[in-house]
Amino acid sequence: MSDLYIHELGDYLSDEFHGNDDGIVPDSAYEDGGQFPILVSNRKKRRNDDMGSGTNHLKSNTFIKREANMLGKNPWPEKDSGGSSVSRDTGTGKDVQDMTLEDTNTSDHGFNGGHVDVVENFSTGDPMLCDTSAATNDGVYNYSLNSIPDAENDLSFFDNGDKEKNDLFYGWGDIGNFEDVDNMLRSCDSTFGLDSLNNEGDLGWFSSAQPNEETAGAMTDDLKPDKMLENQRTAMLQVEDFLNNSEPNHAVEDEYGYTIEDDSAQGKSSQNVFDTSLQKKDILMLDVEANLEKKQTDHLHHLDGKSDGFSENSFTLQHSGISREIMDTNQYYPPSAFQQRDVPYSHFNCEQPSVQVSACESKSGIKSENKPSPSSASNESYTSNHAQSIESLQGPTVDDRFRKVFETRANLLPGQDMPPSFAANTKKSSKTDSMVFPDAAPIQKIGLENDHRKAATELETSNMQGSSCVSSVVDDISLEATSFRQLQQVIEQLDVRTKLCIRDSLYRLAKSAEQRHHGGNRPEKGAGSHLVTGEADKYAGFMDIETDTNPIDRSIAHLLFHRPSDSSLSSDNNVLSYKSHPMIPQPNSSPSLRIEKQEETTELRPEAEVVTSDNN
């Protein structure tokens, strides 16, 4: 809006009201509510200098009526912004009669002219835009912002009543031109360009990154920062109490029920850490037991470079549910280093990481194992004396289980081959990578070792004795199996007819051999009837039996059985072959064999006569 328009408006209103002597300069509180504020140039000379003091007061209710008729009611709706309620009834003469205007206290925020009388109550719903230096008794504002206590003032950060500027509102920064306003709105600054704030703590609930709409909503909503800060303090106190009550216990309990103290809780006491006096007593007691048992078990378990001293190391003794922790007075080792049964080894001491100790837990006691290190002799005997001193009854170890298995096999299977170095390996088990001490007293260990040697010796002797018998039986079985496999391979290469021929031939050869062996009655043949003497008759009968078979049978017999000169041996071999290779007796059922026998009968008889003549 240009300055010319403002001047013309001011002249029009001034002439009208001066003529009736009803001119009035509006109070600075009568503003547009931030909607369309009218800025009047300060360069224009004030016209209220010509007006007397009588024009500064209301004389009658005539102007109130004209005001209501001319401008009407306020067209802009009011907003309930949490402040005092704004009265819409501006036509009452009681409120306007008491209204006075003093030129010395008139602010430059409103219409900057003494005779420029805006006759409408620019009621606003935003009390922060009101001039705090003006006295408002017309019901528009029941109180000023300066008089509001801090506990009840929602917007106390605009409390800058002692400051007077030529700008539109108090408390706002100097706005040079439209670009400054545009930059301020684009940046969405929640402080709205304020240079200095009296109550910066109350702005903590505003976010500088909030959008403009959210910022306006946060300013206009009925939100009380004091209550919000109080709620935040209450929440912080609750969190602090929770953290104090739930302070982490530095004594952490692991999965095995042990208590492990953290580095930050060194000053605190743990229930599993016993007094030093009890530890010293246990150490002395174990020292005495070690000295007594060392003399009895020294000849069984020896390590190269074993020291006679007693090394105070941290390990756990558990017997019948009673646990004792023997700790080094200089250094505490957490119980997590003591592994349970079936748990791999863990490094026990940081100074000697090569030595690994496993303390196995059981109902009857505990068993300690020492894995020696090849680095030095002292490290190899790291816990050997302790292990000898705390030997107690327990379940079988791996070595004991293997020994029992070997003994059982020795009793049940004396013919099996056992490793000859079994005794040497078990005898030198203390010098292997893992030294395992048997779970018995020294006397019992001596007896077990002697029994072990005897069992190993018996195994070796039984193996030597049974090796010859087993070898002979295996040779026989292997010979027969080899022959059978060879015969099977040959037969697989023949056709079905050849296989049937061989079967029938073997059957006839077996029958003839059986007849010769028993010496039964033989039918007389025409070819042998001319024989007179008994000896000739014997040979003639033998040849007759042989001639009952065909040439194929004889060739098969010569191929399969090498018949010796003695007939008795030949018959025995034939009988053995018959019993070892039984055949199905079907010689007469085969028509091909009968045809062959009839065709070869004429050829076999002359041949038999030639043989008998040669014998004579």
Curated annotation (Swiss-Prot):
One of its GO terms (biological process) is DNA-templated transcription elongation. Disruption phenotype: No differences in hypocotyl length when grown in complete darkness, but longer hypocotyls in plants under continuous white or red light. Lengthened circadian cycle. Expressed in roots, stems, leaves, seedlings, cotyledons, inflorescences and siliques. Highest expression in root tips, young leaves and vasculatur tissues. It comes from the Eukaryota. Induction: Circadian-regulation. Maximum levels of expression in the subjective morning. Up-regulated by a light pulse in the middle of the night via the phytochrome family of red/far-red light photoreceptors. Up-regulated following a temperature upshift during the dark period. Repressed by members of the TOC1/PRR1 family of clock genes. Residues 567-577 have a biased composition (Low complexity). GO terms for cellular component: nucleus. Residues 72-112, 361-398, 410-434, 567-616 are annotated as: Disordered. This is Protein LNK1. It comes from Arabidopsis thaliana.
